[in-house]
From Swiss-Prot:
The gene is ddl. Residues 105-306 form the ATP-grasp domain. This is D-alanine--D-alanine ligase. It comes from Syntrophobacter fumaroxidans (strain DSM 10017 / MPOB). GO terms for cellular component: cytoplasm. Its cofactor is Mg(2+); Mn(2+).
Length: 311
């Protein structure tokens, strides 16, 4: 290991549907890393894995700034472990579990966390969609089992839209989640730490008028949505949501940091999903919450590296 600067492998790009987001995040992370403290080597897993393996012995720690398949799903985490390279965030298990929306729901329920009513549509055994609509009511949200950034997601308000939405989900995965649409305030709660989890200020998300929900474009287009931090919630709801973010992190075996999306409906909070590698672009939520907590972007990266090296 280096006796002066830490050698950091910065991984961004990859081959998932979220490649462009990853590249933007990676560029901002590279610019924010303190070059007085770190020697930063950049790798795109889409074509640099052989070089990464060859460089493994000189790498002190990796920053995984990848999203979606082969980034957040435990694949790259397993490779880094086989190479003996520490990395920030969740391990193989936590990454794989959080990436799977259906399994995540089961673990949330097991942990006593509230989720919206939902059903699973399996392409091998297609459900009767009229029965689905009767059981859940409309509107519903249809999501592929594994994709992130709302890729493949549809909101269905009429029965005649349901079949097409499920077919869209099946383009990405054999199974998709059909979830009751909950009207309310969309919030997200980040946590930071290993043994001691620091709950960051909650962010309230208000998609712009052109966006029905916080979808891919709303997330990554500057000015497409408003984010209010801290969220405009009562102290009681705030404390409950922050505790839910901690519990969701633990229920999915996450590590280091995560961000859990939730809906506040009246006095109720419903867990949507947990992100194990939150975005790191100018419009990203986790860095915004950290900044409100007094943690600059550069200091956040320092902290993630420290947490990666704790084990």
């Amino acid at each position: 290991m280096s006796t002066e600067k830490l050698t950091v492998a910065l991984l961004s790009g990859g081959a998932s549907a979220e490649r462009e987001v990853s590249l933007k995040s990676g560029e901002q992370v590279f610019n924010a890393l303190d070059k007085q403290r770190y020697l930063v080597l950049r790798y795109d897993p889409a074509h640099d894995l052989t070089r990464l393996a060859a460089d493994a012995e000189k790498i002190d720690v990796a920053l995984i700034i990848l999203h979606g398949r082969m980034g957040e799903d435990g694949t790259i985490q397993g490779l880094l472990e086989s190479l003996g390279i520490p990395y920030q965030g969740s391990g193989v298990l936590g990454s794989a579990v959080a990436m799977n929306k259906i399994l995540s729901k089961q673990l949330y329920i097991h942990a006593g966390l509230p989720v919206a009513p939902h059903l699973v549509a399996d392409r091998r055994e297609p459900p009767d969609l009229d029965t689905v609509a009767d059981r859940l009511g409309l509107p519903v949200v249809v999501k592929p089992e594994h994709e992130g950034s709302s890729i493949g997601l549809s909101i269905v308000r009429n029965r005649d839209q349901l079949a097409a939405a499920v077919e869209t989900g099946w383009q990405y995965d054999r199974r998709c989640l059909i979830e009751k649409y909950v009207h309310g305030i969309e919030i997200t709660g980040g946590v930071l730490g290993n043994d001691h989890l620091q709950a960051l200020p909650l962010i309230e998300i208000i998609p712009g008028e052109a966006y029905e929900f916080f979808d891919y474009k709303a997330k990554y287009t500057p000015g497409a949505s408003r984010e209010i931090c801290p969220a405009r919630l009562s102290d009681t709801i705030t404390a409950k949501a922050q505790e839910y973010a901690r519990k969701a992190h633990q229920a999915l075996c996450c590590k280091g940091y995560s961000r859990t999306d939730m809906i506040v409906s009246g006095n109720d909070i419903f867990i949507l999903e947990t992100n194990t590698i939150p975005g790191m672009t100018a419009t990203s939520l986790f860095p915004q919450a950290a900044a409100v907590a007094g943690i600059s972007f550069s200091a956040l990266l320092d902290r993630l590296i420290e947490l990666a090296l704790e084990d």
